[in-house]
Amino acid sequence: VLSDVYDNSSLVNNLHFLDDDQTKSYYKASHNNTDWLKLINKGAMSQNYGISVKGGDAIALYAFSVGYNKSEGNIENTDFNRLNVRFNSDIHLTDKLKFLFDIAFAQSENNMRNDGIDEIASPSYLSLIKSPVYSPYQFNRDGSQSTKLSSVDELGVGNPISLVDLSVGLSKKYRFNINALPSYSFTDKLKVGLMFSYTWDKLNEEYFKPSEGLAEQPLVNENGEIYAYSRNMVKNSMAKQTSIHWNAFVDWSPIRNSVHNLDLTGGYRFFSDNLESNYGEGHNTSSDRMNSLSNTTSSLRSTSGTTENWRSMSWYFNADYKYQNRYLLNVVAAMDASSRFGKEAEGALKMGGLAWGIFPSVSAGWIVSSEEFMKDIRFLDFLKLDVSYGLSGNDDLQNYATRSYFNSINFMGSANG
């Protein structure tokens, strides 16, 4: 009865591992006991090296350090390495003038593979779902095994070794940072300072999924329609950000005695950021040996990029008062402006052609454990009661949200309007 319902001969012809005829050319390729997970995994070693030098005297202190780390991944051809260099110093130019300086550089390189649940591009996932009956490599006519990777099997599952050996998943990060803080103490109660910080970050990423040994991937548009098939894929991205920060401040402690302590801080902060990014994606290069974006099919290639700038500034004030070191009062006020705020922002203070947000707060505290009636309570070391009220805000908006009225969109994949 079953033979009437299903044609077994057709099934054998389509699934070679069901055919035990050793004279067939496909027998060796479909009668194996391959441990795919073992083939793509390996033992991994991690190395860490570091050098640190410290020195100085009563006038100047310095510290210099270099560190290097290299860690191999458990999947073949994956690894991570990082180099970091840092120098910082503390210099007393005079009894009143002090200068702090810090400079650092770090770079890292991560060679990785897709490790998610992806039946086309994840070597780990493919090694778990691919049948062990198939050979990872093709066989020559004389029956010897070649070095050429086997293609997609009859079940439509690709070769995970192709992703390990031929794909590219590279991420490179760079960071350079400088901090400087000169300060001058007029007295032991009055100090002024200016902190400057400059940070440069860059990220480069490269991705390539080969065609050899892997299934084609359908490309779907916004309507869910397949418009092409991807044999191989290239992705490149670059992002670069520069950040500058200034903070000019005054610290004043007009009252310091055993009963009263009053510390006042006021200043001005300025932040400036610039971000540049580029992204490109393409499909179907003429060969897996040509894995650059320019070699992809032009109709299946897309690029994008952006340049964004944003700034913010703040005038701030902070007052801390202590009475007998157990009754505490704190008052904070900040006036913030941002390039992301519209000039006519509702509820904002309009001044100097800018919209300012006012953010005050006040808090009071009582260190109960410092009271006389608490000294005999041994099981309690510290008890403090706090009450506070404040207003807060942020500039978590798109950089040009207050200026954009019209945006261009892609039409039918061929025009912008």
Residue ranges of predicted features:
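Outer-membrane beta-barrel architecture
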Residues: G50-K54, S65, N88, N179-L181, ...
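Residue-level signature of outer-membrane beta-barrel architecture
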Residues: G55-D57, I91, I103, P182-Y184, ...
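Predominantly transmembrane beta-strands of Gram-negative outer membrane beta-barrel pores used
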Residues: I40, N48-K70, N74, R86-H92, ...
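Transmembrane beta-strand segments that form the barrel wall of outer-membrane beta-barrel proteins
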Residues: V66-E72, L329-S338
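Short turn/helix-capping motifs enriched in Asx and small/polar residues
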Residues: G347-P360
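Short, contiguous hydrophobic alpha-helices characteristic of membrane insertion segments
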Residues: Y62, W315-A334
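Short Gly/Pro-enriched turn/cap motifs at secondary-structure boundaries
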Residues: I40-A44, T307-E308
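Surface-exposed loop/interface segments of Gram-negative outer-membrane beta-barrel transport/assembly proteins
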Residues: V1-N32, G73-T78, N84, N88-N177, ...
